[in-house]
Design a protein with these regions (language model features):
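Hydrophobic alpha-helical transmembrane segments
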Residues: 1-6, 211-217, 243-247, 308-314, ...
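N-terminal leader/targeting segments
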Residues: 1-88, 97, 316, 687, ...
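Hydrophobic alpha-helical segments
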Residues: 1-20, 327, 428, 433-468
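Hydrophobic alpha-helical transmembrane segments in multi-pass membrane proteins
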Residues: 16, 43-47, 51, 55-57, ...
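Alpha-helical transmembrane segments of polytopic membrane proteins
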Residues: 25-34, 362-363, 421-426, 484-487
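Membrane-interface helix/helix-cap signal primarily in integral membrane proteins
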Residues: 63-265, 565, 606-610, 627-630, ...
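Non-globular, low-confidence helical/coil segments that flank catalytic cores
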Residues: 155-156, 160, 167-169, 210-211, ...
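Membrane-interfacial loop-to-helix junctions in multi-pass transporters
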Residues: 231-234, 290-296, 427
């Protein structure tokens, strides 16, 4: 076996892991392997430079084995897994409320809803019911894990190793998102962490305090040291430089600010931090013997990996650093590309499921970019001063290699990302070094560590001011929409062509123009021709996004995170018409955050009788033209016409092209809207979109819809049976996720845009 063979087989193993994303990926592996085998065996002189045809045959086998390995290592629920309780409760028509005992496995951290989230190792369970005779019908021992969310106050005192008892609603996580780019598939992300059910908890009792020691305790002490010296907000940012964002409760507005300017990596445990720490350690220990220097450097890297919670990106960075130290000890010049390939292969052999981790993917692509592209870019920037040349070349090389995948997942391009990376470099270096030193001192003497952390107050304040200022510049981010997998493959093909071919390297601008065209042309065509409507996967606030050439219409904005993510993936940079179906802040609180990311041109609401002060305050801070929709008078934008039939609660007709929808919100417990519709003539709609509490077959008998969309978690079996008997197609948003209407009148469930070619 030659070195070239080993490299080929390592690449084949990684390729097989990637092809496991596709249901028929094994056919792609066979086709690619057969083409390379045939080309090497019967091709011309160019093919003779490659490894032997036998090596390609072995590589094909390695790729197929890698696919099988991924499938075999994919977690599946055990016989006694707690997730099996959900269908048992449904089968007995029992409430989904349960009492669960188990041990806390991860540190509770806040989610965007303000609740604490963590994983619980399950030991026992018991069902609960308002009817005493039904409680305890199902109980016993169980295995597996639960993804638990708790009110912030209830989860504030929890830590790993505690044995607790929680009551709440047991549920199965939803799928959704792209089948290839699986970043937003909640069910899949939990499955990769050996979790198949969730618990929306409301009450917790601590049964056993568990061990007060562990890595979690070290992390908590570091966080407390920084918080005491800098305050919670600034302290969280500095702690993230040491621990990574997976272990620190960074305020979400700070996370979003870093993301908008292309600096998300600064808050993650990555190679940026390990490179700085290793360089500082080696510089400070220069007077010491060589073995001591390299030993201390290796110790700092291992400690960094432990504190970060062994995130895949941190492991990759630490292994690269250790490999570099080994090369220095042996007096050899390392081959970083070969080392990176070996580390990627070894990590995937250890855990092939890391191939789906976003941090793993972006970390390796960024490192690959630094290895192969940073120096050529720096050479072309010879007109800049040398220090500035390197500051520009490094982030530019990393950005070029991660951009196609980043666009495919998030759909956002940070316009000022390169400038932000250059300007923030010095403060980030200072905070990384200062944060690590204050953390290590704080582990031994907390007051001294906090005093050292206080010295970082003004650098932290400057960094946050800089990031927030750049993020507020006009056009700070552009939503280009999620790329299709073929676009991603072609873009990376162009990048590799520039890297490997000297001939095409000289024509890099031509390939750059081709890549930009490949992204922009589909985006422009889509914005000028697309006409579709999407009911988002939100059962708390019914949300609809209508895309048309005349402008984007959005109905309801209670879920800012879900809505802004959808708008970015669809390439929507402006909301032309925002509509609120009520005047309750609880239902419409997301508009402020949405407007900050995606500007709103016109805001209208249904003139409901109730309007709380928080809602009126939100309207005042929006600073957007506002008016109430008139009763029974259509208001139109392009091909979309909205008419308010009833204001309190809202009943709207939505005319989109030749299709008519009827939106019915019924928050009452007595189906009052059905009674109102019974005495009010309404033309039978093509689509009935319903959201509320109580649903009865009488509503369908009165309205006579052709199709039904229900913004709720689940559907009563009796209602489902009725709709099937009447042959009325229906979609339950809690089960189907996104429901999309096309201009031809068709409805489709869970059809992510970037599963297509473009």
């Amino acid at each position: 076996m030659t070195k070239a063979d080993a490299i080929l087989w390592a690449i084949a193993f990684i390729t097989g892991c990637v092809f496991s994303f596709f249901q028929w990926g094994w056919l792609g592996v066979l086709a690619l392997g057969g083409m390379l085998y045939s080309g090497r065996r019967w091709g011309g002189k160019v093919w003779l430079r490659l490894p032997s045809s036998q090596s390609f045959a072995i590589a094909t086998l390695v790729a197929l084995l890698a696919m099988a390995y991924v499938w075999l290592r994919t977690p599946q629920p055990g016989v006694n897994d707690i997730s099996g309780l959900v269908p048992r409760l449904e089968g007995l028509n029992l409430p989904s409320t349960v009492l669960v005992e188990g041990r806390v496995e991860t540190t509770p951290l806040p989610n965007r809803a303000g609740r604490r989230r963590f994983f619980l190792g399950v030991e026992r369970y018991q069902n609960l019911s308002p009817v005493p005779a039904q409680s305890g019908v199902l109980q016993g021992r169980a295995s597996g894990r639960l993804y638990v969310t708790l009110p912030a106050a209830a989860g504030a005192k929890l830590h790993p190793s505690q044995r607790i008892q929680i009551s709440g609603r047991l549920y199965l996580p939803r799928g959704g998102g792209s089948e290839f780019f699986r970043a937003f598939n909640f069910r899949r992300q939990l499955q990769l962490q050996h979790t198949f059910a969730g618990l929306a908890g409301n009450k917790v009792t601590i049964l056993d305090q568990g061990s007060p020691w562990g890595l979690w305790a070290l992390r908590q002490r570091i966080i407390q040291v920084h918080a005491q010296g800098l305050g919670d907000r600034y302290g969280a940012v500095v702690s993230a430089m040491v621990l990574g964002n997976r272990a620190v409760a960074i305020p979400f507005e700070v996370r979003d600010s870093f993301r908008r300017v292309g600096l998300s990596h600064a808050l993650a445990a990555s190679g940026f931090h390990t490179a700085i720490l290793l360089a500082v350690v080696l510089a400070l220990t220069r007077p010491l013997p060589q073995q001591w220097r390299y030993g201390l450097g290796a110790g700092v890297l291992v400690l960094f990996a432990c504190l970060s919670g062994f995130a895949p990106s941190a492991i990759r960075a630490v292994l690269m650093g250790l490999a570099g130290l080994v090369a220095l000890v042996n007096g050899q010049k390392g081959q970083p590309l070969v080392i990176l390939l070996a580390i990627a292969t070894a990590m995937l052999i250890y855990n092939p499921l890391w191939i789906e981790d976003i941090g793993f993917q972006l970390s390796f692509l960024a490192t690959l970019g630094l290895i192969v592209s940073a120096q050529p870019i720096s050479d072309r920037l010879d007109w800049l001063p040398t220090p500035l040349r390197n500051l520009v070349a490094v982030p530019l090389a990393a950005t070029l290699w991660v951009l196609p995948l980043s666009l495919a997942i998030f759909g956002i391009f940070p316009v000022y990302g390169l400038l932000a990376n250059v300007l923030a470099h010095l403060p980030l270096v200072l905070l990384t070094v200062g944060g690590f030193i204050s953390a290590m001192v704080g582990l031994l003497v907390p007051p001294v560590g906090s005093a050292l952390a206080w010295l970082l107050y003004y650098p932290t304040a400057f960094l946050l001011w800089l990031i927030q200022t750049i993020g507020q510049w006009p056009g700070a981010t552009i939503a280009l929409g999620s790329l299709g997998w073929l676009q991603v493959v072609v873009l990376y093909g162009l990048i590799v062509l520039v890297w490997l071919s000297p001939r095409w390297r000289r024509r890099w601008f031509l390939l750059f123009t081709l890549g930009v065209t490949l992204v922009l042309v589909p985006f422009i065509l889509r914005q000028n021709t697309l006409f579709q409507a999407t009911v988002l996967a939100n059962t708390q606030v019914p949300t609809l996004v209508i895309q048309q050439p005349a402008g984007t219409v959005v109905i309801n904005g209670g879920d800012s995170q879900g809505l802004t993510a959808f708008l970015a993936q669809e390439g929507i940079n402006r909301i032309d018409w925002a509509v609120a179906s009520d005047r309750q802040y609880r239902q419409q609180q997301g508009w402020r955050d949405i407007h900050r990311i995606t500007p709103i041109r016109q805001f209208t609401d249904v003139p409901t009788a109730k309007s709380d002060p928080a809602y009126r305050e939100m309207l005042a801070t929006l600073k957007v033209p506002h008016q109430s929709l008139p009763l029974r008078q259509p208001v139109q934008l392009g091909q979309v016409k909205i008419t308010v039939l009833r204001a309190d609660p809202a009943i709207l007709t939505l005319e989109m092209g030749n299709s008519q929808w009827l939106f019915v919100s019924d928050p009452s417990r007595d189906a009052a809207q059905t009674d109102w519709l019974a005495v009010t003539p309404v033309e039978p709609p093509q689509v009935l979109w319903w959201w509320g509490r109580k649903l009865t077959p009488r509503l369908f008998e009165i309205v006579k819809p052709r199709s039904v969309i229900l913004s709720r978690n689940a559907l009563d079996p009796a209602i489902a049976t009725y709709l099937k008997q009447k042959q009325i197609p229906y979609f339950v948003v809690g089960e189907a996720r996104e429901v999309r209407w096309q201009a031809d009148g068709s409805l489709k469930a869970n059809a992510p845009q970037n599963d297509g070619l473009i």
